[in-house]
């Protein structure tokens, strides 16, 4: 036990990052009324469009939240994830954690075009994505939180950081904790933010090793788990390359409702993604196991922490973009 505690402690001491981000907790140049005089309708416009988009397909809520997450973990929340590849810029869209999982770029384009028609050159793509993620959460039953705004869009992207900074579905707990910690996010933040998987879907390529690996061990193969596992294997064949892009809900109980069901799934040992299940069954999950149990028992506690953690993640800013950033006219390209 002492060895486990030592390893867990070392995660929090060795992996201290050296980056130029303004991490959560510092004085930040973001305010709730940043657009009060320059684009007072921006929140209403984004809300209205998100209502239509989520009504068209509830999965769009998870898509926008995921885009926001992947943006903030690379260079801070600066809209870099939205940049297309050009002759002079290598974008993040083709990085391994993004290429087969991120969508929603056309949704951002749609909202941005409307905002530009009302308030040209005022609202950043980074702010659009941050507000949209909040509204997406609410529209599928999740909590409300105030969104501070005033972010700038970066003129750069980082394929390398997208490859190294973002957690992957098959990653172990210690590595994931380190990645959140490097962004200034705590273990409590991590467990809460991963709760957004309650409305997400995953591709076969991202859960194949789990359902043909230790799923039987963690779920103890009770009759319900056996049935669930059999259905997953029908969706996702064992052979790599076969059915890789087939998808299923990460939360198979209430897949279109933002609730705490995902944590009950982990308690049963039925987590679809290894990275999720690790929070409850890993030998190093002393703290995460307790938090998962708390959120499974108390949905109010989960909602409260999720709101706080989303604000905290949204406050990860890129110092370079703050000083030399811009408001892109088209979220896919740097202004010329």
Curated annotation (Swiss-Prot):
According to its UniProt record, where is this protein located? Secreted
**Which tissues does it occur in?**
Expressed in roots and stems.
Q: Which PROSITE patterns match?
A: PEROXIDASE_1, PEROXIDASE_2, PEROXIDASE_4
The UniProt record lists the keyword Translocase: no
> Which residues does UniProt assign to the signal peptide?
1-20
Q: How is the cofactor bound?
A: Binds 1 heme b (iron(II)-protoporphyrin IX) group per subunit.
Can you cite an annotated GO cellular component? extracellular region
**Reactions performed catalytically:** 2 a phenolic donor + H2O2 = 2 a phenolic radical donor + 2 H2O
Keyword entries, A-Z: Biological rhythms, Calcium, Disulfide bond, Glycoprotein, Heme, Hydrogen peroxide, Iron, Metal-binding, Oxidoreductase, Peroxidase, Secreted, Signal
Residues that bind heme b: 197
Which superkingdom does the taxonomy of this entry point to?
Eukaryota
Hydrolase keyword on record: no
Any one of the GO BP annotations: response to oxidative stress
Q: According to the record, which residues are glycosylated?
A: 246
Q: Which CDD domains match?
A: secretory_peroxidase
The protein's enzyme class:
oxidoreductase
Which cysteines are disulphide-bonded?
A: 39-119, 72-77, 125-331, 204-236
Q: Give the EC number(s) under which this enzyme is classified.
A: 1.11.1.7
Q: Which residues bind Ca(2+) 1?
A: 71, 74, 76, 78, 80
Q: Which GO terms describe its molecular function?
A: heme binding; lactoperoxidase activity; metal ion binding
Q: Which PANTHER family match?
A: PEROXIDASE 11, PEROXIDASE 72-RELATED
State the similarity comment: Belongs to the peroxidase family. Classical plant (class III) peroxidase subfamily.
Q: What does this protein do?
A: Removal of H(2)O(2), oxidation of toxic reductants, biosynthesis and degradation of lignin, suberization, auxin catabolism, response to environmental stresses such as wounding, pathogen attack and oxidative stress. These functions might be dependent on each isozyme/isoform in each plant tissue.
Q: What is this protein called?
A: Peroxidase 11
State the organism named in the record: Arabidopsis thaliana
